[in-house]
Structures are given as structure tokens and as C-alpha cells.
Design a protein with these regions (language model features):
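Signature of N6-adenine DNA methyltransferases within the class I
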Residues: 1, 93-289
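Nucleic-acid modification enzymes, centered on SAM-dependent nucleic-acid methyltransferases
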Residues: 1-100, 243
Length: 289
């Protein structure tokens, strides 16, 4: 695990005026300079190395960060120019990794945000082949069963799917092989994310209460919302009612109830409020305090 101290932003940034366009631009430039400094800060580098170790493919000869490298960075006796550092940081950029304590140090220094509002995505981490290919390759998404879909994906890998469907022969289609590589990368990333979310609390896990079973993003965000608020702050979010009833989220819900953090829970049926969601689907508005 990796413990991060909250870095301080220059105090004068918050004091800079922003009453005119020129003052706003000046403050933006100052903030941009601070972000560049943060990117070179050892804490940011170490955080990227920690997360990047989960994201990188574990293949022979790959530059994978190790515990000794992370400890070396944290204690100042490892070089930031190590190939594994560059690989980890590149993986973090590609995945859109966001380190909250390092991006909002002034809020974290005060124990968190006064208010956190969320409307998280309601989707599972596990890559769903039908959903993935629905817009990218409808023929695969429309396959009548899993066996047929798996066969078409294999043909996609070989660049022969279109030939197979049309009953023709010819050279492999580059676009098919490119799409397969993209699918393979997305599949591996989903697996890496799942591994990261399932790290137990004793090993520095980020989501000890909701990183359970077939993880859904809404549950992770619900736990994150609670982590980001300060002890006297509030958090509010809209999530499926499963947050209070599902077995995979029972530890989280039990925690907020026993900790007297649950200020309110209003449960609704969709009733066509959200056309893309079935009208019988239930969701809840939850407030933590």
C-alpha cells in the first residue's frame, strides 16, 4: 500500500483575484504551472507507480514496477527514470487515473470536502461482449448465443469475420484485427481494474467495503463519496436500490447505518423518469452526514 501526504498548494493561489478576464487567465496560468510541478513531484510519481503496477500487462520482458522500486521512490534511493516508472505512468495516463489527495490537497488537508454530490454510472466493471461490440461490430453483438459470439471474435482476431459471413476468401481485413486488439486491450484493462478494486483493506485496498464480487461502478462511487467528505460534511448520490439490498454492498450499507452516517434514503421506481431504464427498475437518493 502507499500512504500519501497531502501536498500544499502555494497559499497565494487562493488569494489571487479573478474579477476580470485577465485575472482569470493569470490564475489559470499559475494553476497550470502548479499542475506541472505536481506531475514531477515524487508523490505523484509514486502514486502512478503503485496504480500502474495493476494496469500493466504481466508479460515476459515487460517493465513492471516492483515493491522495492516503490519503496525506493518513497525513500529517495530509486531513480524516477527507471523504465518501469515510465511504463506505469503511461498506463495511468491511458486509463485516466485520478489521485484525489494530490489533485485537491487543500480540501484533503481539512479532512475532505464539505459537500460531495454524485450521479455515478450504473454498470459493471466486467467487460460485457455484447455491449462492447454493439456499436463497434453489430454482427458480433447480434450473435444468437455465447458460442457463436466467441467464434466470431476468433474470426475477428484472424481478420476473417467478414469473409466468413459473406462466404468469400481473401486477405485478412486490417480493420478487424485492429478492432480485436482494441477489444483485447479493453478486456485486459477491465481485468486489471477488477483486481485493483478487490485488493483487501489489510493490503491497502481502495474500496474495502464495495470491492466485492461482481463489482458495479455505482457501489465504488458510493464508497468514494463517503471517503471524500470531511467528518462534518455531507454526501448525496443517486444509485440503484441494490446499494441497500444486495449481498455485495451489505458491508458498505451496514457501515453507514451503524456509523450513523445515513441521513436519508428515498427509494423510487423509475416510472419512466429515465426512458433508457426499465420502468420497474428501482433507485435511491441517499444522503450521508
Amino acid at each position: 500500500s502507499l500512504a500519501l501526504a497531502s501536498p500544499k498548494r502555494p497559499a497565494d493561489l487562493e488569494q489571487m483575484p479573478e474579477d476580470s478576464p485577465s485575472e482569470v487567465r493569470a490564475k489559470e496560468r499559475a494553476w497550470s504551472n502548479i499542475r506541472k510541478e505536481q506531475e514531477r513531484d515524487i508523490q505523484t510519481i509514486a502514486a502512478d507507480v503503485w496504480v500502474g503496477a495493476f494496469l500493466l500487462p504481466k508479460t515476459s520482458g515487460a517493465d513492471i514496477p516492483t515493491t522495492s522500486l516503490l519503496e525506493g521512490l518513497a525513500n529517495g534511493f530509486a531513480s524516477i527514470d527507471e523504465p518501469a516508472v515510465a511504463a506505469a505512468r503511461a498506463a495511468c495516463r491511458a486509463a485516466g487515473v485520478f489521485h484525489w489527495p494530490l489533485r485537491f490537497p487543500e480540501a484533503m488537508a481539512e479532512g475532505g470536502f464539505h459537500c460531495v454530490l454524485g450521479n455515478p454510472p450504473w454498470e459493471k466493471i466486467k467487460l460485457q461482449e455484447k455491449e462492447y461490440f454493439s456499436a463497434r461490430c453489430p454482427a458480433i453483438a447480434a450473435a444468437s448465443n455465447t458460442a457463436e459470439r466467441t467464434h466470431l471474435i476468433q474470426l475477428l482476431k484472424e481478420g476473417k469475420m467478414s469473409h466468413h459471413q459473406e462466404g468469400t476468401e481473401g486477405a485478412p481485413a486490417p480493420w478487424e484485427q485492429t478492432l480485436f486488439r482494441q477489444y483485447e486491450a479493453a478486456l485486459r484493462l477491465a481485468g486489471a481494474e477488477s483486481l485493483f478494486y478487490h485488493v483487501p483493506a489489510q493490503d491497502g485496498g481502495r474500496f474495502p467495503l464495495t470491492g466485492v464480487g461482481d463489482v458495479n461502478l455505482y457501489a465504488l462511487f458510493a464508497e468514494l463519496d463517503g471517503q471524500l467528505r470531511r467528518p462534518d460534511g455531507r454526501a448525496g448520490f443517486i444509485v440503484p436500490t441494490g446499494i441497500a439490498t444486495d449481498d455485495s454492498t451489505k458491508a458498505f450499507f451496514q457501515s453507514i447505518v451503524q456509523g450513523r452516517q445515513l441521513a436519508s434514503l428515498y427509494d423510487f421506481e423509475n416510472k419512466e423518469l429515465f426512458p433508457a431504464v426499465h420502468k420497474s427498475y428501482k433507485f435511491s437518493l441517499i444522503t450521508l452526514s
